[in-house]
C-alpha cells in the first residue's frame, strides 16, 4: 500500500470521528506568507515533498495564481497530524489575502471553525488583517496567531531578542484589540491569544521552522539557539529542531475546536431555524445519523466533472445518489459524485459524514451560500461580503456566433464567484461585469478567454457610483396611473452609525422578520423607537419603514411596495446609479379595494416616482467609491509616491518608517486609480510593494459632480443634462 493510499485510508477512518477533526483556515494580509505556510504544513503532513514546499505553492494551482504569485481561489485540502499519540484530521482552506478577492475569504469562513491568522513580523497588523479577523469573528470562527518572517527580524533588521519580544507583544496586542472589538460578547475574553498557553506561535514559513511556549517547554529548544542557526544560515538543522508543521498543527489541535464543540455555538447564530427541532438538534450535535444538511461555500468548474460544489456538512451524511433540496433556489437535485480535496486532486468517497468538508457534483443550480438538505428547512443566513462591486466593464463577443457561449461563460463565472455581478445593459445590449477592483476583473476575464476560448472586446473600466441625499424631504404624494392608489412618503438621510451597522451585518439586510428586535437595535443607534418599529425592509444600505396607521388593504400591496422601493434604490433619479443611505418612510396611503386596480402596473410607478421626487427635494448628491492604498517603498521614493497619490485626488493618511522601508497609507477615489500599477512601478523603478482595499464611499466634490453625472447619463444613452426637480416630480 503506497503512501497516498495509506493517507486516504487514514482520512476515511478519521472522518467518522468528529472529535478528531479540525476545520481550519489560514487568513492574512497579501504577501504575509499564507500560502507558503499552507504548503509547508502539507509537506510536514507528508502530502508534498519537503524540498518543493514553499517553492511549489501547491494550493496556488490555478496557472494565473502561480504567474501572479498571489492566491486567488480558496483551495482546500485534508491531511493527518499526530498530537500526543492520537491522529487528527485537519481540513485546511487557504484563502486569498488580496482585497479584490475578499469574497472567497467570506465564503471560506462559513466552512471552518478555527483560523490561523498570519501576521508578518516586519509589517505587523495591516488593514486586510483587520478585515479578515472581522469576517472570522462574525462567523463565530475562533482565531490563533502565527507571527511569520521572524528570520527577517534576525537577519535583516538585526534585532536583539528583547526588541523582538517587544515587537511580538505589539502584534499580539493589536490582534487582541481586534478580537475585543469584533468577537461575539461571550468570547471577547475567552478567545484572546496568549504566548503562555501556546495560542501564539512564531517562526518562518519560508525556512520551515516555528516555536511556541509549549513546544519549547516540551523539547528544551531555546530561542537563542534558533537565532544562532538563522544567522549561520543552517536551515536544515532549524527545520529538524523546530519543525513548522509540528508547532503550528499542535497549536491547531490544542486550541481550535472540533466540529462537535463548534457547532454547539455556531449553529444558533448561523442558522435561522428552530434549534429545538430534530434537524436543529442534529446540527447542534454534529450527528452523522441525522438528516443531511450542508452549506455550499464554493463552486469550482472542473473540465471533466463539470460543476463541483464544495461545502461544510453540518448534519447527516452526504451520499452519492441522494435526493436533496436546494433551499434558496427552491429546486430539487440529486447528488452524483461525493469526495474530498487533497489540493487540486479530488478523491472520491462513498459517503462523507457531518463535521467534514465535502466536494460533490450534481448540484447544478447551487450557488455559493446555498443550503442543501434532505428535506425543506430554513436556510442559513446570507453570507456577508465585506466589499461591494465598484468597477464595471462592458463585454462584447467579437464574433456574433460566440454570443450564446459568452452568456453561459458569464453565468458560470458569476456562479463560481457571487461577488461578481453580471447584467445586460438593455440600452446597448452589452454585458456588464462588475467586480471589486481592477485586478479582480482582470483575473476573471483572463479565465473567461482561456477556459472558453472566446474572443471578447472589453471596454475601459467604469466606476460604479452611488446616489444619496443630504436632508429630509417634505411629504410627497405618489399616485398610481389610474389615480385609485395614493402613497404619502418622506425620505431622510440615514445616519452613519446605522449605515455602518448594516454594512457590518449587525443589522441584517433583507425583509425584516423580527421588527421589534431590529427596532431596538435602531433605537440604540439613535433612531426614534416609535418610527423604527415600522421597519419592513433593508436593501443595499437603504431602509423602508411603514409608519401608517390602520390603512385598509395595505398589507395586500406591501410586497409590490417593497419591489417598487427596490427598483427606486437600484436606479436613483440623478444618473440611474444605485442609491445608498436613504430611509424611505411611508406615512399614509389609500389603496383601492379591488385588486384588479392595484396590480404591479399601478403600484410600481406610484411608489418609485414618489421616492425619486422626494429625493430630488432632499438635495441629492453623488458618492464615489474610495480605495485604501498601502505602499511599501525604499525611503528615497517617498516624494515620487506622494506626488503620484496627490495627482489622483488622493490623501496621505499615515506614514511609518521601519529601517530603510517606508509604509505609506493613503486613500484615493477608485476612478482615479486605474493604471496606478504601471505608474507606481515606473515611479519607483519597480521597487514598490502595494495593495489596496475598499474604503467605502465618499461624497463627490460639487465642482466634479455635475460633470460626472453628465458623463454617466451620456454613457447610458440618457439626456446628458442632469435632471431638475420638475423633470422628476410629476405634475398632479
Swiss-Prot record:
Annotated ranges, domain tr-type G: 19-260
Family annotation (PROSITE patterns): G_TR_1, G_TR_2
Binding site for GTP: 28-35, 94-98, 148-151
Modified residues (Diphthamide): 597
Keyword rRNA-binding among record annotations: no
Pfam name, any one: GTP_EFTU
Localization annotation: Cytoplasm
GO CC, one annotated term: ribonucleoprotein complex
Keywords: Cytoplasm, Elongation factor, GTP-binding, Nucleotide-binding, Protein biosynthesis
Domain of life: Archaea
A Gene Ontology molecular function term of the record: GTPase activity
Protein family membership: Belongs to the TRAFAC class translation factor GTPase superfamily. Classic translation factor GTPase family. EF-G/EF-2 subfamily.
Function: Catalyzes the GTP-dependent ribosomal translocation step during translation elongation. During this step, the ribosome changes from the pre-translocational (PRE) to the post-translocational (POST) state as the newly formed A-site-bound peptidyl-tRNA and P-site-bound deacylated tRNA move to the P and E sites, respectively. Catalyzes the coordinated movement of the two tRNA molecules, the mRNA and conformational changes in the ribosome.
Protein known as: Elongation factor 2
Organism: Pyrococcus horikoshii (strain ATCC 700860 / DSM 12428 / JCM 9974 / NBRC 100139 / OT-3)
Amino acid at each position: 500500500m503506497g503512501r497516498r493510499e495509506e493517507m486516504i485510508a487514514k482520512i476515511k477512518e478519521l472522518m467518522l470521528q468528529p472529535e478528531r477533526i479540525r476545520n481550519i483556515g489560514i487568513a492574512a494580509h497579501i504577501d504575509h506568507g499564507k500560502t507558503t505556510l499552507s504548503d509547508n504544513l502539507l509537506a510536514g503532513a507528508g502530502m508534498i515533498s519537503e524540498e518543493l514546499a514553499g517553492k511549489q505553492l501547491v494550493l496556488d494551482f490555478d496557472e494565473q495564481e502561480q504567474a501572479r504569485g498571489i492566491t486567488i481561489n480558496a483551495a482546500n485540502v485534508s491531511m493527518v497530524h499526530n498530537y500526543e499519540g492520537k491522529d487528527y484530521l485537519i481540513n485546511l482552506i487557504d484563502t486569498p489575502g488580496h482585497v479584490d478577492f475578499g469574497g472567497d475569504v467570506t465564503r471560506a469562513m462559513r466552512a471552518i471553525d478555527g483560523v490561523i491568522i498570519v501576521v508578518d513580523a516586519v509589517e505587523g497588523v495591516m488593514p486586510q488583517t483587520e478585515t479578515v479577523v472581522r469576517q472570522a469573528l462574525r462567523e463565530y470562527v475562533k482565531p490563533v496567531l502565527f507571527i511569520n518572517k521572524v528570520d527577517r527580524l534576525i537577519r535583516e533588521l538585526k534585532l536583539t531578542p528583547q526588541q523582538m519580544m517587544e515587537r511580538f507583544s505589539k502584534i499580539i496586542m493589536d490582534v487582541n484589540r481586534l478580537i475585543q472589538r469584533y468577537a461575539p460578547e461571550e468570547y471577547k475574553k475567552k478567545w484572546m491569544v496568549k504566548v503562555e498557553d501556546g495560542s501564539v506561535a512564531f517562526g518562518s514559513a519560508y525556512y520551515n521552522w516555528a516555536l511556541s511556549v509549549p513546544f519549547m517547554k516540551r523539547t528544551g529548544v531555546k530561542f537563542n539557539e534558533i537565532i544562532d542557526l538563522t544567522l549561520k544560515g543552517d536551515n536544515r538543522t532549524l527545520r529538524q529542531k523546530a519543525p513548522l508543521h509540528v508547532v503550528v498543527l499542535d497549536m491547531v489541535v490544542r486550541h481550535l475546536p472540533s466540529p462537535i464543540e463548534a457547532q454547539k455555538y455556531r449553529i444558533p447564530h448561523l442558522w435561522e431555524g428552530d434549534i429545538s427541532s430534530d434537524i436543529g438538534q442534529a446540527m447542534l450535535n454534529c450527528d452523522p445519523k441525522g438528516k443531511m444538511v450542508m452549506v455550499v461555500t464554493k463552486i469550482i468548474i472542473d473540465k471533466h466533472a463539470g460543476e463541483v460544489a464544495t461545502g461544510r456538512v453540518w448534519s447527516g451524511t452526504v451520499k452519492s445518489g441522494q435526493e436533496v433540496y436546494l433551499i434558496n433556489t427552491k429546486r430539487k437535485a440529486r447528488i452524483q459524485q461525493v469526495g474530498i480535496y487533497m489540493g487540486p486532486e479530488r478523491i472520491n468517497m462513498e459517503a462523507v459524514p457531518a463535521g467534514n468538508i465535502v466536494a460533490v457534483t450534481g448540484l447544478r443550480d447551487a450557488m455559493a451560500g446555498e443550503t442543501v438538505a434532505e428535506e425543506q428547512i430554513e436556510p442559513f443566513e446570507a453570507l456577508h461580503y465585506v466589499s461591494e462591486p465598484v468597477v464595471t466593464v462592458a463585454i462584447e463577443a467579437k464574433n456574433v456566433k460566440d454570443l450564446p457561449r459568452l452568456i453561459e461563460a458569464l453565468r458560470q463565472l458569476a456562479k463560481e464567484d457571487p461577488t461578481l455581478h453580471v447584467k445586460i445593459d438593455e440600452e446597448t445590449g452589452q454585458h456588464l461585469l462588475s467586480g471589486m477592483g481592477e485586478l479582480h476583473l482582470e483575473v476573471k476575464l483572463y479565465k473567461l478567454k482561456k477556459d472558453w476560448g472566446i474572443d471578447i472586446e472589453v471596454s475601459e473600466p467604469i466606476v460604479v457610483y452611488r446616489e444619496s441625499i443630504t436632508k429630509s424631504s417634505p411629504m410627497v404624494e405618489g399616485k398610481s396611473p389610474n389615480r385609485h392608489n395614493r402613497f404619502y412618503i418622506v425620505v431622510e438621510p440615514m445616519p452613519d452609525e446605522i449605515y455602518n451597522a448594516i454594512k457590518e451585518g449587525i443589522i441584517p439586510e433583507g425583509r425584516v422578520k423580527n421588527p421589534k428586535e431590529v427596532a431596538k437595535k435602531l433605537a440604540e443607534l439613535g433612531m426614534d423607537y416609535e418610527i423604527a418599529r415600522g421597519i419592513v425592509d433593508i436593501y443595499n444600505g437603504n431602509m423602508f419603514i411603514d409608519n401608517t396607521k390602520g390603512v385598509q388593504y395595505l398589507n395586500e400591496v406591501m410586497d409590490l411596495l417593497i419591489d417598487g422601493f427596490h427598483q427606486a434604490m437600484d436606479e436613483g433619479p440623478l444618473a440611474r446609479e444605485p442609491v445608498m443611505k436613504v430611509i424611505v418612510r411611508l406615512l399614509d396611503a389609500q389603496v383601492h379595494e379591488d385588486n384588479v386596480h392595484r396590480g404591479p402596473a399601478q403600484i410600481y410607478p406610484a411608489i418609485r416616482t414618489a421616492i425619486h421626487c422626494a429625493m430630488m427635494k432632499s438635495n441629492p448628491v453623488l458618492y464615489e467609491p474610495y480605495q485604501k492604498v498601502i505602499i511599501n517603498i525604499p525611503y528615497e521614493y517617498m516624494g515620487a509616491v506622494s506626488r503620484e497619490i496627490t495627482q489622483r485626488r488622493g490623501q496621505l493618511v499615515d506614514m511609518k518608517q521601519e529601517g530603510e522601508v517606508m509604509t505609506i497609507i493613503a486613500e484615493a477615489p477608485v476612478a482615479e486609480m486605474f493604471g496606478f500599477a504601471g505608474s507606481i512601478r515606473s515611479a519607483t523603478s519597480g521597487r514598490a510593494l502595494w495593495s489596496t482595499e475598499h474604503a467605502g464611499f465618499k461624497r463627490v466634490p460639487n465642482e466634479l459632480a455635475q460633470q460626472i453625472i453628465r458623463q454617466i447619463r451620456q454613457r447610458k444613452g440618457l439626456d446628458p443634462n442632469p435632471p431638475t426637480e420638475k423633470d422628476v416630480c410629476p405634475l398632479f
